[in-house]
Amino acid sequence: MDRSMRIAFLSEHASPVALLGGEDAGGQNVYVDEVSRNLARRGYAVDVFTRRTSPAEPEVINWAPGVRVVNLSAGPAEFRLKDELWPLMPAFRNAFLQFMLHDEVRYNLIHGNFWMSGWIAIELRRRLDIPVVQIFHAMGKTKRRHQGAVDTSPSERITVESEIIREVDRLIAQCPDEWSELVNDYGAAPDKVVVIPSAVNSHMFRPVPRDQARRYIGLDTNGPVIVYVGRMLPRKDVRNIVRAVALLAREASTTSARGTPLPPVTLLFVGGETSEPDPIATPEIGELQRLAAELGITERVRFAGKRQQEMLRYYYSAGDVAVTTPWYEPFGLTPLEAMACGRPVIGSAVGGITFTLMDGITGFLVPPRDPPSLADRLYQLLSQPALRERMGKAARARVEREFTWSTVAHRTDLLYRALLSPQLSPRLPSRILEMERKG
């Protein structure tokens, strides 16, 4: 395959290699991995530049056909939290330029991920005079608005984001909510912002029969199971789910409030820093254990620890319903993963979740920080098997129709071509995709 078009994918803290385990991996890692692979399948050569976090990491890894991961030295070769990396970005920029000289490689376009890589991208644009596409994955103003004093982002973040928005050639928003943030909060030119939603690997995340999935993961219950998969962070508000389950348990002995009581419900948490649930390594697990004990539902709450991506379909499928109720979520891949596994989702009506989850069709939207509302919707789904099945099928169909990585790569390819060959490309609308909010 002729790979004459070469892309520099910048992702300073989120390497696709992290998906193999050993360090925390989130949505940005998945995005970088899947988009680079799918762009390579379309004929691009993609080099993913990330920061070396261990002396044992080689400089270049042949990650997939047409994709290399380049580990650049910027500061000590050790893991650091992403909010501690900002002072190392000039060294990252310099290491990129040195790699170009040493490898004698030239790039047609730079694709920045996150605000720090965006800063590197515009620094390189000034030196190399090549176009830049930027995706933020999360915006500083929105994070500060929701997290307030507990926001650990560097003080320069919002100023740098504004500079990036002014200077790059195109901005990718993952949902209409993010498009509005870029245009209304930061003053981005509307025709510079393109909506290209992220996606899910619909082969890796596929339905497994419930009983088979429970046997596979060793979950010994025939009763209803609520599953949460994801990071154990305060902004994910997993404590909200514990409180909602406690409300259901409290009402289990009465028929006055909701009609027929539910059988005992199991709440399964999948995630954390280690494969075995460890409240020292993952403090939020300890908080959840204490809260469950305080509310008298310790025996109903189980922790699976961190699991590899290819195992997650069994955990989603073991559940009757998946729940994610963060009070802040830029996009959120876990609702799509659950939907791909044919499970209805109850999610907070925030950020990208309001875009991916179709209220009343693929699940339900609920207000954040509202355990009674969540308990109401949990009861509705857990007490109505036919409703669960109908919503689960609609969820899977929506993913197959709108949220595949090949579709993301196709839309990104259109964007690249419009920048690289404007005289040959059709005019690109400011929103590549206006997604149907109807089934």
Indicate where each model-derived feature is located.
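N-terminal subdomain of nucleotide-sugar transferases
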Residues: 1-69, 436-439
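A short helix/loop element that forms part of the nucleotide-sugar donor recognition site in Leloir-type
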Residues: 206-219
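Conserved donor-binding/catalytic core segment of Leloir-type glycosyltransferases
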Residues: 220-236, 242-245, 268
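Short alpha-helical donor nucleotide-sugar binding micro-motif in glycosyltransferases
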Residues: 306, 314-319
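Aromatic "clamp/platform" in nucleotide-sugar-dependent glycosyltransferases that forms part
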Residues: 327
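Short hydrophobic beta-strand element within catalytic cores of glycosyltransferases
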Residues: 344-347, 357
